[in-house]
UniProtKB/Swiss-Prot annotation:
Free-text comment on the cofactor: Binds 1 Mg(2+) or Mn(2+) ion per subunit.
Protein's recorded name: Phosphoribosylamine--glycine ligase
Residues where ATP binds: 134-195
Organism per entry: Streptococcus pyogenes serotype M18 (strain MGAS8232)
Necessary cofactors: Mg(2+); Mn(2+)
Keyword Nucleotide-binding recorded: yes
Pfam families: GARS_A, GARS_C, GARS_N
Pathway annotation from the record: Purine metabolism; IMP biosynthesis via de novo pathway; N(1)-(5-phospho-D-ribosyl)glycinamide from 5-phospho-alpha-D-ribose 1-diphosphate: step 2/2
InterPro entries named in the record: ATP-grasp, ATP_grasp_subdomain_1, PreATP-grasp_dom_sf, PRibGlycinamid_synth_ATP-grasp, PRibGlycinamide_synth, PRibGlycinamide_synth_C-dom, PRibGlycinamide_synth_C_sf, PRibGlycinamide_synth_CS
List of residues binding Mg(2+): 284, 286
Keywords: ATP-binding, Ligase, Magnesium, Manganese, Metal-binding, Nucleotide-binding, Purine biosynthesis
GO biological process terms held by the UniProt record: 'de novo' IMP biosynthetic process; purine nucleobase biosynthetic process
GO molecular function: ATP binding; metal ion binding; phosphoribosylamine-glycine ligase activity
Reaction(s) catalysed by this chain's protein: 5-phospho-beta-D-ribosylamine + glycine + ATP = N(1)-(5-phospho-beta-D-ribosyl)glycinamide + ADP + phosphate + H(+)
Length: 421
């Protein structure tokens, strides 16, 4: 069968590569993809994510069995609804179900209604009221744009002044446009963060290995928030009892609640969690695979990925198996200056194969050449599976030291939280 992956980043590269390795899959198209993906035998389609009608026409012309939707903005724009209306199958939530991600206020309302543990909060569209709430609550405190903001709409403010400034930028200065026209202001939760993913159809779900992402740009969790600078899975120091608690107090009630609300969920559910003294609590929901977590979770899948997704969509019990030993670790290489201003067109090192996988995010061929150049903030990611986090770090960082990363940067401490002296 022929499949279509919608999106262009490292996440979509990992999804498409895994689908192409599946038994019954002959060809995988990625729209729009990036040039680095072609090195893995993937076919690019020059249609951007927002052009739903062109994507649908392409899927029909090329007899695509189903589409896998990667990015959040496409889901929020109703791409799955449009595919379904055209008689095509797509793996991802409808616009109504995706509101769990594209409105943080809606997600909070669902959590409160279905008794899901999360931070206390207030939602505001009026700056003066938001300011008064911040001053009343004190710092540290968290200010979030209600809508989608490319993973950059969250400010963990260490002072009241910082929080007020963040609220002002969103509500008065229009920093995130409509996405920041409302803000959710939350209590700061103290603890270690981790991610839990599940394949979902309605109230049926299948949990994936736990993962830990590294959001800040620089070593030691310093610098601005990014889309993610690296990750590893599973999280070796996280007790299974914590995962079980998260499943029973968070994943199950939320999915059953969405069914009860008439918004049944299909796709990948990503729960951003924090382990507090009171147990796991929700920081955020994402209604699709995470980036960079996808790149370290999918290499651990030992069953047939395309068959698994097909079964889940058809309501058939899937046979899903995971590698149950070792750790998969990945480090993102980004353009200098990311997540703020950065240059494009930096020459990239040659692709690694074998023990170290290269997933491309922002990469394009130079004109009239097969040399890859940087074409985005996050550029590529190196991933390996080893016996331990330390062994994974050694493998990746040795490889990176041998690469010419002039004009690029990466964190040197991905996975260090898992190494307990």
């Amino acid at each position: 069968m022929k499949l279509l992956v919608v999106g262009s980043g490292g996440r979509e590269h990992a999804i498409a590569k895994k689908l192409l390795a599946s038994k019954g899959v002959d060809q995988v198209f990625v729209a729009p993809g990036n040039d680095g993906m072609t090195l893995d035998g993937l076919d690019l389609v020059n249609i951007v994510v927002s052009e739903h009608s062109r994507l649908i026409a392409f899927a029909k012309e090329n007899e695509i069995s189903w589409a896998f939707i990667g990015p959040d903005d496409a889901l929020a724009a109703g791409i799955v609804d449009d595919f379904n209306s055209a008689g095509l199958r797509a793996f991802g939530p409808t616009k109504a179900a995706a509101e769990l991600e594209w409105s943080k206020d809606f997600a909070k309302e669902i959590m409160v209604k279905y008794n899901v543990p999360t931070a206390a909060y207030g939602t505001f569209s009026d700056f003066e009221k938001a300011k008064a709430y911040i001053e009343e609550q004190g710092a540290p405190i968290v200010v979030k744009a209600d809508g989608l903001a490319l993973g950059k709409g969250v400010v963990v403010a260490e002072t009241v002044e910082q929080a007020v400034e963040a609220a002002q930028e969103m509500l008065l200065d229009n920093k995130f446009g409509d996405s920041g026209a409302r803000v959710v202001i939350e209590e700061f939760l103290d603890g270690e963060e981790f991610s839990l993913f599940a394949f979902v159809n309605g109230d049926k779900f299948y949990i994936m290995p736990t993962a830990q992402d590294h959001k800040r740009a620089f070593d030691g969790d310093k610098g601005p928030n990014t889309g993610g600078m690296g990750a590893y899975a599973p999280v070796p120091h996280l007790p299974q009892s914590v995962v079980d608690t998260a499943v029973e107090t968070i994943v199950r009630p939320v999915l059953e609640g969405m069914v009860a609300e008439g918004r049944p969920y299909l796709g990948v559910l990503y729960v951003g969690l924090i382990l507090t003294a009171d147990g796991p609590k929700v920081i955020e929901f994402n209604l699709r695979f995470g980036d960079p977590e996808t790149q370290i979770i999918l290499p651990r899948l030992t069953s047939d990925f395309a068959q698994n997704i097909d079964d889940i969509m058809m309501g058939i019990e899937p046979y899903i198996t995971w590698q149950n030993d070792g750790v998969t670790l990945g480090v993102v290489v980004a353009s200098e200056g990311y997540p703020l201003d950065y240059e494009k067109g930096v020459p990239l090192p040659e692709k690694t194969d074998g023990d170290i996988i290269t997933y491309y995010a922002g990469a394009k061929f130079a004109e009239n050449s097969k040399a890859l150049l940087s074409n985005g903030g996050r550029v590529y990611m190196l991933v390996t599976t080893e016996d331990s986090v330390k062994a994974g770090q050694d493998k990746i960082y040795t490889q990176l030291a041998q690469q010419d990363t002039t004009g690029l940067f990466y964190r040197n401490d991905i996975g260090s939280k898992a190494i307990r002296e």
